[in-house]
Every structure is written in C-alpha cells, then in structure tokens.
A protein has these predicted regions:
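ABC family nucleotide-binding domain
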Residues: 2-214
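Conserved beta-strand-loop-alpha-helix hinge in the C-terminal portion
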Residues: 216-225
C-alpha cells in the first residue's frame, strides 16, 4: 500500500548540494506498523514528508495507495492525502480559533461527510475527551491537545497515518498514555502506521523498524511485537 522507490532528496546550500536522503527503498503492507529511527539529521522527517506527498524527491518516487505521487500535481497529491492520509505531529497543529470538536470536524467536513458533528463527537469520546469537546486549544493540556490531534487524524478513517515524534512535547507518562491510545486506535481501524521516533521502546512496539543514518537506510528489521 506504500512503496518508496530509490528516494533521493537534495537541496542547495551555500556550500553546494546537500544530500538529505540517498536511494531509500522499502515497502509497507496494509495494516503494518513501522517505526523510522535514527540520529538527528538522518533524514527521518524528510522521508515522512516524501511518503505523504508533502514534498517531492529529487529522484525516485513514492506509490501511495496505488498512486505514483510524482505523477501528480499539488492538487492531485492533496486529494490523495485527503482521501487516504492522517497526520499527527509533535506540535499538535490544532486550529486555535476552533474548539476541540470543531478541530476534529474539520477534515470530515472537507471530505464531505454527511454528519461531521456526530462522527467527530464519537471519536472525541473514544479518545477520552467527552467532557472537553467545547474547550479551545489554549484551554487544553499538552496531552489533551495531542488526543484531539489523534482524534482528528483517525476521524476520516485514513488508510495510512503518519506520526512525526507525536510524544516529543509531552512528559514520559503522558507520552506513554498517548501512544497506548494511538496503537489501540490503530489496531481497531487496521490503519497503516508510519511513526518517526527517538524512543526505542516505542519503536519496539511496531512491526518493523527502519533505521536511517546520514540519509541512507541502514537497517530494516522486524521486531518481536
């Protein structure tokens, strides 16, 4: 359902061409959970952006749910994301002028869902915020904000969820609770999960671990999960 074919990403810098990713290839099956690990600067977030069609590779291509993302213009890639992809980021990316329920309703309304409010309330309840749905992001704790972000990501029942350091701004206890919630929702929905993390214990909960170093894929290993 997700394939990376010899992905390379290069950018110009004052010192010349900078290689961020070099010839990265792998595939991810439907429903699989995959962690992407590596030191800072290894290219993890760049890889995630390419896999989601938020950026295009210098060479190579990504197939997502049967679509070659490099063959599509930005509108075409946006349509694929709207139909197939959910995102959870370290910094939450909630709309500050919308309350929790409205933030979750937003992708449902954009997708033309018949009853966005009812669907959003249902998943808000699932993530444990039944009594906080009317609160705005500024009124929520970090853990609550991430619960809203997770609810928003799963609301449209995406084929694949991309999570970039989703516990990076949370304390260890809150982060553990958030990841337990994310893995539970992932199991229940059979969504494919691609997770960028520095947390080895979190990576071990995934089916596979992809390790990047200096832009190259140096390991692709199955876990005991």
């Amino acid at each position: 359902m997700l394939e990376a074919h010899q992905l390379s990403k290069e950018v110009s810098s004052p010192e010349g061409t900078l290689t961020i990713l070099k010839d990265v290839s792998f595939s991810v099956d439907a429903g699989e959970t995959v962690a992407v690990v590596g030191p800072s600067g290894a290219g993890k977030s760049t890889l995630l952006a390419l896999l989601a069609g938020l950026d295009l590779p210098t060479r190579g291509h990504v197939d997502l749910n049967g679509a070659n993302l490099s063959d599509l213009d930005e509108d075409g890639r946006a349509l694929v994301r709207a139909e197939s992809v959910g995102f959870v980021f370290q910094s939450f990316h909630l709309v500050p002028s919308l309350n929790a329920l409205e933030n979750v309703m937003l992708p449902l309304e954009l997708a033309g869902h018949g009853d966005a409010r009812k669907a959003a309330r249902a998943i808000i309840d699932k993530v444990g915020l039944a009594d906080r749905w009317s609160h705005y992001p500024a009124q929520l704790s970090g853990g609550e904000k991430q619960r809203v972000a997770i609810a928003r990501a799963f609301a449209t029942e995406p084929a694949v969820l991309f999570a970039d350091e989703p516990t990076g701004n949370l304390d260890s206890r809150t982060g553990a609770n958030i990841m337990a919630l994310m893995f539970e929702l992932n199991r229940n929905s059979s969504t494919t999960l691609v997770l960028v993390t520095h947390d080895n214990s979190l990576a071990e909960r995934c089916d596979r671990i992809l390790a990047l170093d200096i832009g190259s894929l140096v390991s692709d290993a199955r876990t005991a999960a």
